[in-house]
Amino acid sequence: MFTVISWIIIALEVIFIGFLTFMAIKKRKITLTENVWYFIPSVLILYALYATELVYSALDTGEKLIIYEFINIIKVCLNVFKPEIEYADSLLLATNGVYSVAFFIGVLLALGVFITFIINVIYYFFYAKIRISKILRSGCDILIADDDDADTYMHTYPNTILLLQDYPTRDVKKVYREKGIVYFVVNLNESALINRFSKFINNGKDYNIVCIKERDYTLKLVAVFKSFVKQTASENFYLHVEFYYKNFKSINEVVSADKEFSPYINCFNKYELVARKFIQNYPVTKFVPAEFFNYEKAIVKPDKKINVLYVGFGKMASTIFSASMINDKLVTENNSSLTEKFVNYYLYDKECNKDESKNKSFYNDRYFAQEYNKDEYFAPIQKNNNVEYKCCNIEHNDGAKDYQSKLTNNKDEFHNIIITLGSDVENVDTAIKTVLYLRQHDVENYHIFIRLKAESEEYKAFFDSQKITFFGGESYILNHSIIVDEALMARAKMVNSSYEEKKKAISKWTKLSSIKKLSNVYAGLNLRLKLNLLGYDLIQNDGQNFDGEIVSELVSRLGKQTPPVDAPYQDYLYFNSDGFNSANALSYQEKLRWNAFYLDNGYALMKKTDIKVISGDKIIKDDDSKKLHACLTTVEGLDEYHQQLAKELSKITNKPIEQELINVDTYKYDYSVLDVIKTFKEDSPMVIVKRS
């Protein structure tokens, strides 16, 4: 009987060993017994072995068994390092070989489970500490986010530590271990942050505290971070904090107005981030055929039309639209003179009253509410009428007819179609119907952008066309390259450096006002469109696609066309001449973009009498607190402004007005694209290539 019992125990041991082996292979770990529940089967096997020995001994000696002895076995089983059976006195061990095998397997199994458990505890404790230390030493992102958002973010940027305010439960810890998520627990107060990060302050590495989704303590976090920066004099810690769509702009303006801390605090909104990435990757020129452009002049041909259709106009689409109206400024020619080339926008919205803010005119009402007479102001910018807003459902007859009427089969028109209706299914369905209509009517000049939240390959399989682009998924938004975006900030700093080189007084990047920094960011975003107008493009640097000859070719071309710093004043007045070159066209395009940027941010014209010339390097021409700027005018108005500054400077310096017309830098900033192109090198994140 005891031999049979021993064989049963061996069978159970083999099953348990097989289970542990299977789990080790599945998890690809030898030290797999981090789960305390693995103790139960090993203890039960030991209990069966000791109980079998107890019964055998009692039968052999004729002693009466009592319940206490069976209870005492539990204590013996838990003390796996000191087996209570004396090998010399164990009758069953001495007489039954099968039981002996079962016993030694059971003891070794229990010891193995216990030892590997201890190894796991030590391993995970020190491994986590080592990983945290290694990540912190190299500079990293410190993430405050929900588990799903954290998983998405850390998957795209492993050099991230999750910051928790409360200790996670055992189940959550297990999930973190399985996903390789590194975390620490820190209270959100300045003393706790100082204690945790004091060793890494100003160590030459950057640390980004990223808070995804607005929370009850978000504003408190901003205040705590300010105190942290002030107490530590830190210049390498940055806070990136998300605010809801409706709260974002007003809070961002207040936070950014604090010049002491605004260089270190970035308020963001996911829709704004998507919009920036969208216009950076897909300017309105991106997919337009080469025959629409005159690359030698960097213009769109006068007889060509570019249309952008927004199918669905919620938060996502309206934010992209606003960014596009800033970025997608184009130029053409009329009688050998430069003029703006308007992109035609058609907005289809089936939920017209859901959010009133999205229905507002692109240009802020404040700008057009005033009467700008010529005596008090420079020439105001004329309002564009190239936006057509429709409140309709394109699934219904009237809406469908209007939508389809814009999708013309005309070789001189190109259609960018952006579909952001709502659910992924609805967006894909609308795209399928749109593609079918375009094919039926032989429309070739188009590109469709479909927003997919889920990034499902199954949805993408519905389309085999090169004229389809998907955007807007979670990993599209929740990642380091979008929220922190060092490449874009580096390009913005390049733009600012070029601007500052043309000034007599250099302003440190961190001391710039928030609007000027943001202006440089959008100037950096616009580089791809400018390159498209020249016949070039930007792509990711894979380490092998950099072509120095292309950069040299562009620098040589634009260098010959760009007036030198000490050039006569008249060399910049291309808008009064009978001809122009590509550098002139890009300068004019930059002026249009700059105007659009400041208009979108609520600025209006400053009165002529409010402009003050203090000295050659100190001119009061704007007021960020009132959102006023003297240069928010036409190119003709800018020339009048330039003349006024030269006259005022001439009174101060006693130099001829002709000399001060050269010294005043009004026009030179718009030619900065050449200086930015010069910075592209073999190790740049992006490289310039010729358009295919």
Question: What is the predicted function of each stretch?
Answer:
Residues 2-46, 55-75, 85-107, 111-593, ...:
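Cytosolic regulatory regions of ion transport systems
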Residues 613-621:
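An amphipathic alpha-helical core segment
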Residues 606-607:
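Aliphatic-rich, non-membrane protein domains
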Residues 600, 625, 629-630:
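Active-site-proximal, well-structured secondary-structure segments within enzyme catalytic domains
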Residues 82:
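…; additionally, a secondary subgroup of soluble metalloenzymes is captured
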